Curated annotation (Swiss-Prot):
This is 2-oxoglutarate and iron-dependent oxygenase domain-containing protein ICU11. The gene is ICU11. SMART domains: P4Hc. Keywords: Dioxygenase, Iron, Metal-binding, Nucleus, Oxidoreductase, Vitamin C. Disruption phenotype: Altered plant morphology, including epinastic (curved downward) cotyledons, hyponastic (curved up) leaves, and reduced palisade mesophyll cell size. Reduced number of leaves at bolting and early flowering. The double mutant seedlings icu11 and cp2 skip the vegetative phase, flower immediately after germination and then die. GO terms for cellular component: nucleoplasm; nucleus. Disulfide bonds: none annotated. It comes from Arabidopsis thaliana. PANTHER family: 2-OXOGLUTARATE AND IRON-DEPENDENT OXYGENASE DOMAIN-CONTAINING PROTEIN 2, 2-OXOGLUTARATE AND IRON-DEPENDENT OXYGENASE DOMAIN-CONTAINING PROTEIN ICU11. One of its GO terms (molecular function) is dioxygenase activity. Residues 238-339 form the Fe2OG dioxygenase domain. 2-oxoglutarate binds at R330. InterPro entries: Oxoglu/Fe-dep_dioxygenase_dom (IPR005123), Pro_4_hyd_alph (IPR006620). Its EC number is 1.14.11.-. Its cofactor is Fe(2+); L-ascorbate.
Length: 397
């Protein structure tokens, strides 16, 4: 289960756990045919079109293999799909801790059990179809993948928070119907499913029901290009993994959501409907781990009201929560988008003033202190010079 990091309540508002990052070695693995060990690329090959691994019996998520393929050395890119899968599997098994390996295998068994029993209601929405899913304004932004095009279809309603129309009403209705069908299957089969995170008691992890590849393609083809333009400090390279789920609020569902940060570099939140009141999101500044519980400033206060079919895109470290849904039923698609490169680089950094409000305040404080200290030194030297001049003048007289 993915976690969110709940935060202590903030003075400005009444209203998952960020995992410890392990020190990772530079991966090397045998090609399986006696060749010297090959090293992964440091950055993904964006021009390479990776394979689909859905039909192979793998120990890890097929989308992980698809994402990892972009990092393969040039010597392997033209190998057969089986050879590439074998190389990547060997790599993952070699560098995954035993506990992680066991967790992954158990999760795979859990997903396989669901997939073998669950009968899809709308099979067509499990494959990304941009023309059927997306609003024309969102599709238009991708006629040319440029910053002016992206910004023309989005509103930066607050620094670092972008809102835009994304899904057609018909797609929202079909996805909601599919989720209701999932919940009926869970009830009828007396199954137990994992909830999206540690803070939501209701909702469905879409990846566990077969949406993994569709959502990863959504990240690769649409969210990642946008994020690299809008959030270059955390998405200088591709977003290479995700966690996608549905949350539900209202009667007999969750009521609100506490103050927290997401386990993501960039988060996409799309309201699917239905009729509801309340449920506004409140944001209170971007923070790194060190400053995650620091106070907010008045300039960091921003509230957002959901609109069905419309999305809000923000940094995962942008602290936020959801107020109570006072009537009706609200359902949202949440997509946590992650960058393994950024997470690795973050292990070696101490200053995040490029995006953390707390680090930025600390840096400004240090700069002010340095300027004041320099002024004091200059003033002291000027005073000493004046005293020397007065003493010299006195001696001369």
């Amino acid at each position: 289960m993915c976690n969110q990091t709940p935060l202590r309540s903030m003075a400005l508002d009444s209203s998952g756990k960020q995992p410890e990052q392990q020190q990772q070695q530079q991966p090397r693995a045998s090609s399986g045919n006696g060749e010297a060990r090959l090293k992964l690329r440091r950055t993904p090959n964006e021009e390479h079109e990776p394979e689909n691994y859905e039909d192979l019996p793998l120990d890890y998520s097929p989308s992980l293999f698809t994402s990892l393929e972009r990092y393969l050395p040039e010597q392997l890119l033209n190998s057969t799909r089986i050879d590439k899968a074998s190389f990547m599997r060997d790599l993952l098994l070699r560098y995954s801790p035993d506990t992680e390996r066991v967790r992954v295998l158990r999760h795979k068994e859990y997903r396989d059990k669901i997939m073998s029993s669950y009968q899809r209601l709308h099979g067509e929405i499990y494959t990304l179809d941009p023309s059927s899913f997306f609003a024309p304004s969102f599709l238009g932004a991708f006629s040319r993948k440029s910053e002016p095009n992206f910004r023309s279809s989005m509103v930066e309603s607050y620094p670092g928070i972008f809102t835009f129309e994304m899904f057609k009403p018909q797609f929202c209705e079909m996805l909601l119907a599919e989720v209701e069908h999932m919940e009926k299957w869970v009830y009828d089969s007396r199954s137990t499913i994992m909830r999206p995170n540690t803070m939501n008691n209701f909702g469905v992890v879409l990846d566990d029901f077969g949406f993994d590849s569709m959502l990863q393609k959504l990240v690769d083809d649409f969210i990642s290009p946008i994020a690299q333009v809008l959030f270059p400090e955390v998405c200088g390279t591709s977003l290479d993994s995700h966690h996608g789920y549905i949350v539900e609020y209202g009667k007999d569902r969750d009521v609100d959501l506490g103050f927290h940060v997401d386990d993501s570099e960039v988060s996409l939140n799309v309201c699917l409907g239905k009729q509801f009141s309340g449920g506004e999101l409140y944001f209170r500044g971007v923070r790194c781990d060190k400053h995650v519980n620091s106070d907010s400033t008045e300039k960091e206060v921003y509230d957002y009201s959901h609109v069905p079919g419309h999305a809000i895109l923000h940094r995962g470290r942008h602290r936020h929560g959801a107020r109570a849904t006072t009537s009706g039923h609200r359902a949202n698609l949440i997509l946590w988008c992650r960058s393994s490169t950024f997470r690795e680089m973050k292990n070696y950094q101490r200053d995040f003033s490029g995006w953390c409000g707390g680090c930025k305040l600390d840096k400004q404080r240090r700069q002010r202190d340095s300027i004041n200290a320099t002024k004091e030194i200059l003033a002291r030297k000027a005073a000493e010079k004046t005293l020397v001049e007065l003493a010299s003048k006195s001696c001369a007289e």
